[in-house]
Amino acid sequence: MIQSHVPVMLNEMLEALSPKDGESYLDCTFGAGGYSKAILESCNCYVTALDRDPNVIKRAEEIQQNYGERFDFVETNFADSFAKLKEKKFDGIVLDLGVSSMQLDIADRGFSFLHDGPLDMRMSGQGLSAEEFVNTAEEKELADVIYKYGDESFSRRIAKRIVEYRKTARIDSTGKLAEIVRSSIGFRKGKIDPATKTFQAIRIYVNDELGELEQFLVNVKNILKKDGRLVVVSFHSLEDRIVKNFFKENSEKPVVRSKYAKDDMTIDPNKWLKIITNKALASSDKEVGLNIRARSAKLRAAKAIYE
């Protein structure tokens, strides 16, 4: 069953994407369908949605029943989507890089430290699971992953405790891992749960989320029409840095060769984006008050000035 999910920065996403009648849009991270549905309801447009999680197919079918040929779903991760999209181009593309509530709230998915369940964390159910990683990785690798992807200053202490624990028993549940992390750091009431950063780090590593994002951005020019908009909502400083650097590296004002000849200009064909958001937009205090998962969200948007 799909749990209730509140899309983050929904209004800001729609404003940046600016959907129009007759145009086609790509939702790279379908999840519970919040963005796709909002885009479809905003005007008489078309949406193609992607997701590698087979558990969202039922929700996609529900939306397809309501919107017919205006909606299409493809089961794939967005980095591998280019072949399946068959050279189709879009007027706008949106990525929500966060984990949806339906994934966090279902214990069997193994994403959440709030719900005890199998230690899995795989979006697609394939590849290395969190359980395999936690129980087989060397202490240094564990510490490096937790530090790099979780910004966790206690990463070495946590990694040491994990290795000590697994000498006596296998770490096979989210509850066990959460308690190991909490016992390593200490848990002060009212503060963010100490397990937050470690769980985030392992999830990002297991699903190669940063690698997938980088691979997609390298190829996104091939599927975005001229004047098409690219909107990315990220939840981690490393994700935001990748997006920020990509926008910066691919957007630049035309270079004037001579200060006396305004028409003597060159345009670098690799600088194909115009940044819409001068700096990352953050969730409003009101939204964070209603949805705590919005607290770390950042939105960046850019427009293709030519193909």
From Swiss-Prot:
Spans traversing the lipid bilayer: none
Primary role: Specifically methylates the N4 position of cytidine in position 1402 (C1402) of 16S rRNA.
Name assigned to this protein: Ribosomal RNA small subunit methyltransferase H
GO molecular function: rRNA (cytosine-N4-)-methyltransferase activity
Catalytic activity: cytidine(1402) in 16S rRNA + S-adenosyl-L-methionine = N(4)-methylcytidine(1402) in 16S rRNA + S-adenosyl-L-homocysteine + H(+)
Enzyme Commission identifier(s): 2.1.1.199
InterPro entries the record matches: RsmH (IPR002903), SAM-dep_MeTrfase_MraW_recog (IPR023397), SAM-dependent_MTases_sf (IPR029063)
Pfam family for this entry, one: Methyltransf_5
Keyword Nucleotide-binding applies: no
Alphabetical keyword list: Cytoplasm, Methyltransferase, rRNA processing, S-adenosyl-L-methionine, Transferase
Cellular component, GO, one term: cytoplasm
Subcellular localization(s) per the UniProt record: Cytoplasm
Family: Belongs to the methyltransferase superfamily. RsmH family.
GO BP terms, alphabetized: rRNA base methylation
HAMAP family named in the record: 16SrRNA_methyltr_H
